[in-house]
């Protein structure tokens, strides 16, 4: 049964989606090798916001990605990767040596975990084209013209002040132009401190409609922080329904502009086996998804697949329980796909997982 979706601002026509961030070169030693022992690396591309644009494009959403990459073979190859997956890249900037002197594409190294050994990421993103380009030159009124939904994350502003100022400007402009805004805090301890992330991301909340994750934010006053036991920074790591409902309500009381909050909860059994479920606050109620247990081929991008799954479900006016279950199923499927992004192009495969249908498709 269809219902009026408050997130779509009364517009149930096909939506145009845009996201902004850094697309990176990903280098991974093959066969679960450790980086210090590797003699070769597999090359691919990724990045949180790019992953979401790509996942939505593969599911048929009109999806655009904006970034700055160097005008060289690496930058052009990253753009080609996006375009080959139906992501519109027209607004992307291929910078010159004069505009970005280091002329670098951001890079990260992934050491894939196995069994009890966790995966490890090493970033090499300083002086990348996105961080060096003068982002004040970007005309956001022109960039956002014709779009309905903007997605941002807390990763890009962690890169430097240039990016942090730009993302705040994006948030303000998007709200002025009436776009739906989603935001994922996506804390990365290797890029900035918890305190820096919390101060910045809390500034973003008044502009957000759909929030992914519940950290890092100034959620509690010092005298009411309930952290204890398996809680960290005022957030329960593996919450009960009642705990999560209380946390969500605390967000809504402070930020009534939020129309939806969603977080996934991971249970780590080993480096190669996890369980996953999610909670979502929507239209005054907290919903809890099914719990999935699965083996992992590639964990990177699981959170991005969750976000893209929920955005897709919202854009297609799913019922609340179907929205959160579709999001979790999208994330679970991503764990079975090598690379950063969820390249699933068959919505029925995600729905089948929602219904626990594992039959061979012929």
Which stretches of residues belong to each language-model region?
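Glycine-rich phosphate/adenosyl-contacting loop at the front of the ribokinase-like
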Residues: 2-92, 113-116, 133-136, 288-290, ...
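Conserved phosphate/ATP/ADP-binding segment of small-molecule kinases
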Residues: 191-283
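Conserved post-catalytic alpha-helical subdomain immediately downstream of the catalytic base
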Residues: 271, 290-356, 360
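A short helix->loop->beta-strand "cap" motif at the edges of active sites that frequently abuts
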Residues: 173-180, 255-259
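Hydrophobic faces of well-ordered beta-strands that scaffold small-molecule active sites
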Residues: 181-183, 211
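Active-site beta-loop-alpha junctions enriched in small/polar residues
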Residues: 126, 155, 186-190, 216, ...
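Conserved N-terminal subdomain of the carbohydrate kinase-like
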Residues: 62, 66-154, 181, 350-362
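Catalytic-core regions built around general acid/base machinery
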Residues: 166-178, 200-207
